[in-house]
Amino acid sequence: MDEVVSTASYASTVGSMTFRKTDHHKNAIDYEVAGLMWLAAARPDGAGIVEVLDHGKGWLTEPELSTGHPTREAAEDFGRRLAHTHAAGASHLGAAPDGFVPDDGYIGRAPLPLPSEPISSWGEFYAQYRIEPYMDSLDADARAIMSKLVDLLASGALDHDEPALVTCPAARTHGDMWAGNLMWTPDGVVLIDPAAQGGHAEEDLAALSVFGAPFAERIRAAYNEESPLADGWEDRIGLHQLHMLIVHCWLFGGGYVDQTVAIARRWV
Protein backbone atom coordinates (compact mmCIF):
# COMPACT_ATOMS: atom_id res chain seq x y z
CA MET A 1 0.00 0.00 0.00
CA ASP A 2 1.30 3.48 -0.84
CA GLU A 3 1.89 5.73 2.13
CA VAL A 4 -0.83 8.31 2.78
CA VAL A 5 0.41 11.80 2.02
CA SER A 6 -1.01 13.93 4.81
CA THR A 7 -0.02 17.44 5.85
CA ALA A 8 -1.42 20.15 8.07
CA SER A 9 -1.11 23.91 8.32
CA TYR A 10 -2.59 26.70 10.40
CA ALA A 11 -4.01 30.09 9.43
CA SER A 12 -5.48 33.01 11.36
CA THR A 13 -9.01 34.12 10.48
CA VAL A 14 -10.56 37.10 12.29
CA GLY A 15 -9.00 36.35 15.64
CA SER A 16 -9.30 32.59 15.44
CA MET A 17 -7.07 29.85 14.13
CA THR A 18 -8.03 27.24 11.59
CA PHE A 19 -6.47 23.90 10.79
CA ARG A 20 -6.13 22.79 7.17
CA LYS A 21 -5.56 19.10 6.57
CA THR A 22 -4.57 17.62 3.23
CA ASP A 23 -4.55 13.96 2.31
CA HIS A 24 -4.13 12.81 -1.28
CA HIS A 25 -4.91 9.16 -0.70
CA LYS A 26 -7.96 8.09 -2.69
CA ASN A 27 -11.21 9.31 -1.07
CA ALA A 28 -9.56 9.83 2.34
CA ILE A 29 -10.81 13.39 2.85
CA ASP A 30 -14.24 12.57 1.41
CA TYR A 31 -14.52 9.73 3.92
CA GLU A 32 -13.39 11.90 6.83
CA VAL A 33 -15.75 14.76 5.96
CA ALA A 34 -18.72 12.42 5.54
CA GLY A 35 -17.87 10.74 8.83
CA LEU A 36 -17.59 13.99 10.77
CA MET A 37 -20.91 15.25 9.44
CA TRP A 38 -22.64 11.91 10.08
CA LEU A 39 -21.42 11.81 13.66
CA ALA A 40 -22.31 15.47 14.21
CA ALA A 41 -25.88 14.77 13.10
CA ALA A 42 -26.40 13.04 16.46
CA ARG A 43 -26.15 16.40 18.22
CA PRO A 44 -27.33 18.13 20.39
CA ASP A 45 -27.46 15.08 22.67
CA GLY A 46 -24.50 13.32 21.05
CA ALA A 47 -20.77 13.75 21.58
CA GLY A 48 -18.93 16.86 20.45
CA ILE A 49 -17.51 16.54 16.93
CA VAL A 50 -15.01 18.93 15.36
CA GLU A 51 -16.70 21.17 12.80
CA VAL A 52 -15.90 20.98 9.10
CA LEU A 53 -15.55 24.63 8.07
CA ASP A 54 -14.78 23.95 4.42
CA HIS A 55 -13.50 21.14 2.25
CA GLY A 56 -12.53 20.29 -1.30
CA LYS A 57 -10.70 17.63 -3.24
CA GLY A 58 -8.01 16.30 -0.93
CA TRP A 59 -8.37 18.91 1.82
CA LEU A 60 -10.55 20.09 4.69
CA THR A 61 -10.49 23.00 7.11
CA GLU A 62 -11.44 22.77 10.78
CA PRO A 63 -11.24 25.19 13.70
CA GLU A 64 -8.18 24.82 15.87
CA LEU A 65 -9.49 23.51 19.19
CA SER A 66 -8.51 25.10 22.49
CA THR A 67 -7.10 22.50 24.83
CA GLY A 68 -8.10 22.03 28.43
CA HIS A 69 -7.32 19.49 31.13
CA PRO A 70 -9.07 16.12 31.32
CA THR A 71 -11.50 15.97 34.23
CA ARG A 72 -13.77 13.35 35.71
CA GLU A 73 -16.79 15.56 35.03
CA ALA A 74 -15.90 16.03 31.35
CA ALA A 75 -15.27 12.31 30.99
CA GLU A 76 -18.65 11.40 32.43
CA ASP A 77 -20.42 13.96 30.26
CA PHE A 78 -18.65 12.53 27.23
CA GLY A 79 -19.65 8.99 28.17
CA ARG A 80 -23.31 9.95 28.35
CA ARG A 81 -23.14 11.86 25.07
CA LEU A 82 -21.33 9.03 23.30
CA ALA A 83 -24.22 6.74 24.20
CA HIS A 84 -26.53 9.02 22.21
CA THR A 85 -24.15 9.21 19.25
CA HIS A 86 -24.14 5.43 19.11
CA ALA A 87 -27.92 5.37 19.46
CA ALA A 88 -28.28 7.44 16.26
CA GLY A 89 -27.49 4.14 14.59
CA ALA A 90 -26.51 2.81 11.18
CA SER A 91 -28.19 0.55 8.65
CA HIS A 92 -25.79 -2.35 9.17
CA LEU A 93 -22.40 -3.34 10.50
CA GLY A 94 -19.72 -1.80 8.31
CA ALA A 95 -22.10 0.77 6.81
CA ALA A 96 -20.37 3.83 5.39
CA PRO A 97 -21.40 7.25 6.73
CA ASP A 98 -24.14 9.03 4.83
CA GLY A 99 -22.76 10.88 1.82
CA PHE A 100 -19.85 8.50 1.22
CA VAL A 101 -20.29 6.09 -1.66
CA PRO A 102 -19.41 2.65 -0.28
CA ASP A 103 -15.74 1.97 -0.87
CA ASP A 104 -12.83 1.27 1.43
CA GLY A 105 -12.47 3.84 4.17
CA TYR A 106 -9.38 4.28 6.32
CA ILE A 107 -8.35 3.73 9.90
CA GLY A 108 -5.16 5.72 10.17
CA ARG A 109 -3.10 4.70 7.12
CA ALA A 110 -4.73 1.28 6.82
CA PRO A 111 -7.61 0.47 4.45
CA LEU A 112 -10.95 -0.21 6.13
CA PRO A 113 -13.48 -2.41 4.30
CA LEU A 114 -17.00 -0.95 4.31
CA PRO A 115 -19.34 -3.68 3.03
CA SER A 116 -22.47 -2.39 1.32
CA GLU A 117 -24.61 -5.38 2.29
CA PRO A 118 -25.61 -6.48 5.80
CA ILE A 119 -23.72 -9.37 7.42
CA SER A 120 -25.72 -11.96 9.34
CA SER A 121 -23.96 -11.55 12.69
CA TRP A 122 -21.49 -9.35 14.52
CA GLY A 123 -19.01 -12.21 14.86
CA GLU A 124 -19.06 -12.96 11.14
CA PHE A 125 -18.61 -9.28 10.33
CA TYR A 126 -15.78 -8.83 12.83
CA ALA A 127 -13.98 -11.93 11.58
CA GLN A 128 -14.37 -11.24 7.85
CA TYR A 129 -13.90 -7.47 7.74
CA ARG A 130 -12.05 -6.42 10.88
CA ILE A 131 -9.60 -9.27 11.55
CA GLU A 132 -8.92 -11.33 8.40
CA PRO A 133 -7.91 -8.42 6.08
CA TYR A 134 -4.89 -7.69 8.29
CA MET A 135 -3.73 -11.23 9.10
CA ASP A 136 -1.21 -11.36 6.26
CA SER A 137 1.06 -9.19 8.42
CA LEU A 138 1.41 -12.00 11.00
CA ASP A 139 3.83 -14.91 11.11
CA ALA A 140 2.55 -18.48 10.77
CA ASP A 141 2.18 -19.12 14.51
CA ALA A 142 0.26 -15.91 15.10
CA ARG A 143 -1.95 -16.54 12.07
CA ALA A 144 -2.80 -19.99 13.41
CA ILE A 145 -4.09 -18.53 16.68
CA MET A 146 -5.97 -15.75 14.93
CA SER A 147 -7.52 -18.25 12.50
CA LYS A 148 -8.97 -20.18 15.43
CA LEU A 149 -10.50 -16.98 16.76
CA VAL A 150 -11.83 -16.05 13.32
CA ASP A 151 -13.60 -19.41 13.10
CA LEU A 152 -15.08 -18.98 16.57
CA LEU A 153 -16.27 -15.46 15.77
CA ALA A 154 -17.79 -16.51 12.45
CA SER A 155 -19.75 -19.28 14.18
CA GLY A 156 -21.68 -16.65 16.16
CA ALA A 157 -20.58 -18.10 19.49
CA LEU A 158 -19.27 -14.74 20.69
CA ASP A 159 -22.17 -12.57 19.48
CA HIS A 160 -23.69 -10.18 22.01
CA ASP A 161 -26.24 -7.39 22.08
CA GLU A 162 -25.68 -3.69 21.52
CA PRO A 163 -26.23 -1.31 24.47
CA ALA A 164 -29.80 -0.55 25.48
CA LEU A 165 -30.21 2.71 23.54
CA VAL A 166 -28.98 1.21 20.26
CA THR A 167 -32.11 -0.11 18.55
CA CYS A 168 -30.76 0.00 14.97
CA PRO A 169 -28.89 -2.93 13.39
CA ALA A 170 -25.59 -1.23 14.26
CA ALA A 171 -24.31 1.68 16.34
CA ARG A 172 -23.07 4.92 14.79
CA THR A 173 -19.42 4.62 15.78
CA HIS A 174 -16.37 6.86 15.60
CA GLY A 175 -14.29 3.83 14.70
CA ASP A 176 -10.84 5.05 15.81
CA MET A 177 -11.36 6.17 19.38
CA TRP A 178 -7.83 6.04 20.72
CA ALA A 179 -6.73 8.66 23.23
CA GLY A 180 -5.29 11.04 20.62
CA ASN A 181 -8.64 11.46 18.91
CA LEU A 182 -10.29 12.82 22.06
CA MET A 183 -9.64 16.55 22.40
CA TRP A 184 -10.23 17.80 25.94
CA THR A 185 -11.42 21.37 25.40
CA PRO A 186 -12.74 23.84 28.00
CA ASP A 187 -16.24 22.98 26.74
CA GLY A 188 -15.82 19.22 26.98
CA VAL A 189 -14.52 16.37 24.84
CA VAL A 190 -14.52 16.89 21.07
CA LEU A 191 -13.83 13.98 18.72
CA ILE A 192 -11.54 14.30 15.69
CA ASP A 193 -10.20 12.03 12.92
CA PRO A 194 -12.91 9.37 12.76
CA ALA A 195 -13.09 6.11 10.85
CA ALA A 196 -16.86 6.45 11.06
CA GLN A 197 -18.97 3.39 10.32
CA GLY A 198 -21.78 1.20 11.48
CA GLY A 199 -20.17 -0.86 14.21
CA HIS A 200 -20.61 -2.38 17.62
CA ALA A 201 -20.70 0.28 20.32
CA GLU A 202 -18.39 -1.71 22.58
CA GLU A 203 -15.54 -1.28 20.09
CA ASP A 204 -15.39 2.49 20.62
CA LEU A 205 -15.48 1.99 24.37
CA ALA A 206 -12.75 -0.65 24.28
CA ALA A 207 -10.49 1.46 22.05
CA LEU A 208 -10.26 4.09 24.78
CA SER A 209 -7.88 1.84 26.71
CA VAL A 210 -5.59 0.76 23.88
CA PHE A 211 -3.37 3.78 24.48
CA GLY A 212 -4.73 4.91 27.82
CA ALA A 213 -7.32 7.67 27.37
CA PRO A 214 -7.70 9.71 30.57
CA PHE A 215 -10.62 8.66 32.75
CA ALA A 216 -11.53 5.78 30.42
CA GLU A 217 -13.21 3.92 33.28
CA ARG A 218 -15.37 6.96 34.11
CA ILE A 219 -16.33 7.35 30.45
CA ARG A 220 -17.47 3.72 30.32
CA ALA A 221 -19.24 3.90 33.67
CA ALA A 222 -21.24 6.99 32.68
CA TYR A 223 -22.04 5.42 29.32
CA ASN A 224 -23.28 2.27 31.06
CA GLU A 225 -25.56 4.34 33.28
CA GLU A 226 -27.01 6.14 30.26
CA SER A 227 -27.26 3.10 27.97
CA PRO A 228 -26.73 -0.18 29.87
CA LEU A 229 -24.25 -2.51 28.21
CA ALA A 230 -24.86 -6.21 27.65
CA ASP A 231 -23.78 -8.56 30.43
CA GLY A 232 -20.10 -9.45 30.25
CA TRP A 233 -19.03 -6.25 28.52
CA GLU A 234 -15.98 -5.80 30.76
CA ASP A 235 -14.71 -9.26 29.78
CA ARG A 236 -15.08 -8.32 26.11
CA ILE A 237 -12.93 -5.18 26.19
CA GLY A 238 -9.91 -7.08 24.88
CA LEU A 239 -11.97 -8.78 22.18
CA HIS A 240 -13.17 -5.42 20.92
CA GLN A 241 -9.63 -4.03 20.97
CA LEU A 242 -8.41 -6.65 18.53
CA HIS A 243 -9.36 -4.71 15.41
CA MET A 244 -7.32 -1.68 16.41
CA LEU A 245 -4.44 -3.88 17.53
CA ILE A 246 -4.27 -6.01 14.40
CA VAL A 247 -4.35 -2.84 12.29
CA HIS A 248 -1.27 -1.75 14.23
CA CYS A 249 0.30 -5.14 13.52
CA TRP A 250 -0.38 -4.53 9.83
CA LEU A 251 1.12 -1.05 9.97
CA PHE A 252 3.98 -1.45 12.44
CA GLY A 253 4.42 -5.08 13.54
CA GLY A 254 6.62 -5.37 16.62
CA GLY A 255 5.10 -5.73 20.06
CA TYR A 256 1.59 -5.26 18.75
CA VAL A 257 1.70 -8.85 17.46
CA ASP A 258 2.38 -10.31 20.91
CA GLN A 259 -0.37 -8.18 22.43
CA THR A 260 -2.86 -9.21 19.75
CA VAL A 261 -2.10 -12.91 20.04
CA ALA A 262 -2.23 -12.80 23.84
CA ILE A 263 -5.78 -11.45 23.73
CA ALA A 264 -6.84 -13.97 21.10
CA ARG A 265 -5.54 -16.85 23.24
CA ARG A 266 -7.98 -15.93 26.01
CA TRP A 267 -10.85 -16.81 23.70
CA VAL A 268 -9.51 -19.90 21.95
Residue ranges with predicted function:
Residues 1-15:
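ATP-binding glycine-rich phosphate-binding loop
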Residues 12-121:
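ATP-binding pocket architecture of kinase catalytic cores
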Residues 25-26, 55-59, 66-68, 131, ...:
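Short, solvent-exposed loop/turn segments at secondary-structure junctions
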Residues 57, 186-188, 242:
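Short strand-connecting beta-turns/loops that link adjacent beta-strands
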Residues 90-172:
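An alpha-helical support segment within catalytic cores of ATP-dependent transferases
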Residues 115-127, 166-172, 179-235, 254:
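Active-site Asp-x-Gly
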Residues 238-246:
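Hydrophobic alpha-helical segments that form the core
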Residues 248-268:
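ATP/Mg2+ or Mg2+-diphosphate-binding catalytic cores
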